[in-house]
Amino acid sequence: MVHYVKMEDGKVMPIQEMLKSIERYNPEHLKVIEAYVEEQARENQYDLEANLACLKLYQFNPHLLNLDITYIILLKALTNFPHTDFVLCKCLLLPAQMNDETVKEIIYLADILEKCDFSLFWSRLAKHPENYQKISGFHDSIRKFVCHVVGITFQTIERGYLMQLLGNVEEKVLLSWLKRYGWKEEGGLVTIATQEDNIKTKHITEKIEFDNLAPLMANCL
């Protein structure tokens, strides 16, 4: 669904177009942007530019700060690991946001994810389920990051360990992820893509002009 904002002259502009203009700093558009953030959570969508614009408006207008929207923005940034979206969002936080207990918890979760301590991440998440319930597709987005890390780290991995890294998932959930990434299971081991699949030979050709060689040849005489 496309969100629109109404300009002072009465014209209507799509929110993506508004975000590319100076109007992104107009606090009158904040409610529309916040509604767009909530839609991202419901519909499993993601728009980093809109979320950063929202945090920037909070910076310029601290009296308009909405902590619930802040939580959604930070949690959505978590779902886009290993990209640096979370760092960008964190840099725009006000002291009032940084001192909030839920924000502190989300930042802690980000630190755990960055260290790839997935077992700790899932156990910590289970203690505060209310923090992410509004984020559609949250678990699967994190599992996608887990599979990314597994794919660049392992050639084979124990089946039970992989299930643990994915959040102690059930059999059918594991099988769906194996199918998604084309991983094969045999004898309790899951085979990830071989090194030959991951490493591609690169042929590098460098063109050297004679004029560039002339000084070097002169020095050799």
Swiss-Prot record:
The keyword ATP-binding does not apply. GO terms for cellular component: eukaryotic 43S preinitiation complex; eukaryotic 48S preinitiation complex; eukaryotic translation initiation factor 3 complex. It comes from the Eukaryota. Residues 46-215 form the PCI domain. GO terms for biological process: formation of cytoplasmic translation initiation complex; regulation of translational initiation. GO terms for molecular function: ribosome binding; RNA binding; translation initiation factor activity. Keywords: Cytoplasm, Initiation factor, Protein biosynthesis. It holds the Pfam family CSN8_PSD8_EIF3K. It is found in: Cytoplasm. The keyword Protein biosynthesis applies. Its main location: cytoplasm. InterPro entries: ARM-type_fold, CSN8_PSD8_EIF3K, eIF3k, PCI_dom, Transl_init_fac_sub12_N_euk, WH-like_DNA-bd_sf, WH_DNA-bd_sf. Component of the eukaryotic translation initiation factor 3 (eIF-3) complex, which is involved in protein synthesis of a specialized repertoire of mRNAs and, together with other initiation factors, stimulates binding of mRNA and methionyl-tRNAi to the 40S ribosome. The eIF-3 complex specifically targets and initiates translation of a subset of mRNAs involved in cell proliferation. Belongs to the eIF-3 subunit K family. HAMAP family: eIF3k (MF_03010). Component of the eukaryotic translation initiation factor 3 (eIF-3) complex. This is Eukaryotic translation initiation factor 3 subunit K. It comes from Anopheles gambiae.
